[in-house]
């Protein structure tokens, strides 16, 4: 039920925050070549960014599961297969056991960056382009889609600069997608199942958010 899902998510999100923070630090030390002994990371700031990022992630899963809210264009296969978190969950299920090459790539991070960018700035960007796209969508038989800009702080890249500047490996992001996608069985007899975000209500989302703030 929804209460059980929200309780499970509270623990999953905490684990995700640790994985995400460690991956950002790994990228700083390796790819970015930052000497953290000379330029230490503000641990409190990084934790706050990870909190914002994970709530961003959770919120996208929520609005994709609720297409009636009108934010995520789930009727468009172009969006679902190319950009959506729902589609990314499917991809992760297929490649979970794949090679180290897949694990060391950045496909998941690149897809999420594009998705969050479109959500914050809208797609196409700019009001004029947006209006044109709506007309094209009406007149065309192609699987076009539009997204209105969702100018909420949790999607503002200025609030997650450390994460935005990092490149996050698939091996870390696969763990995060798994934790946010697959339920943990309460006992040995239960099977792991895919979490249904359509079962979550506003109250449960609020409870998860409060749990994040108390992290």
PLM-predicted stretches and their roles:
Residues 1-215:
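Preference for the N-terminal adenyl/adenosyl cofactor-binding alpha/beta module
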């Amino acid at each position: 039920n929804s209460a059980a899902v929200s309780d499970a998510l509270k623990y999953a999100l905490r684990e995700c925050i640790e994985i995400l923070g460690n991956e950002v630090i790994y990228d700083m030390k390796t790819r970015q070549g930052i000497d953290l002994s000379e330029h230490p990371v503000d641990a409190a700031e990084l934790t706050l960014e990870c909190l914002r990022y994970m709530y961003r992630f959770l919120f996208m899963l929520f609005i994709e599961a609720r297409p009636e809210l009108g934010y995520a264009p789930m009727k468009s296969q172009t969006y679902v297969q190319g950009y959506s978190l729902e589609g990314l969950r499917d991809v992760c299920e297929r490649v979970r056991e794949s090679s180290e090459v897949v694990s060391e790539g950045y496909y998941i991070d690149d897809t999420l960056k594009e998705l969050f960018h479109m959500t914050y700035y809208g797609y196409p960007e700019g009001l004029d382009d947006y209006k044109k796209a709506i007309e094209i969508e009406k007149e065309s038989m192609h699987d076009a889609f539009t997204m209105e800009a969702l100018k909420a702080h949790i999607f503002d890249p200025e609030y997650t600069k450390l994460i935005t500047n990092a490149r996050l490996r698939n091996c870390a992001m696969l763990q995060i997608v798994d934790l946010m996608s697959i339920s943990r069985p309460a006992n040995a007899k239960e099977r792991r199942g895919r979490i249904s975000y359509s079962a979550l209500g506003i109250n449960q989302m609020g409870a998860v958010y409060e749990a994040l703030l108390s992290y």
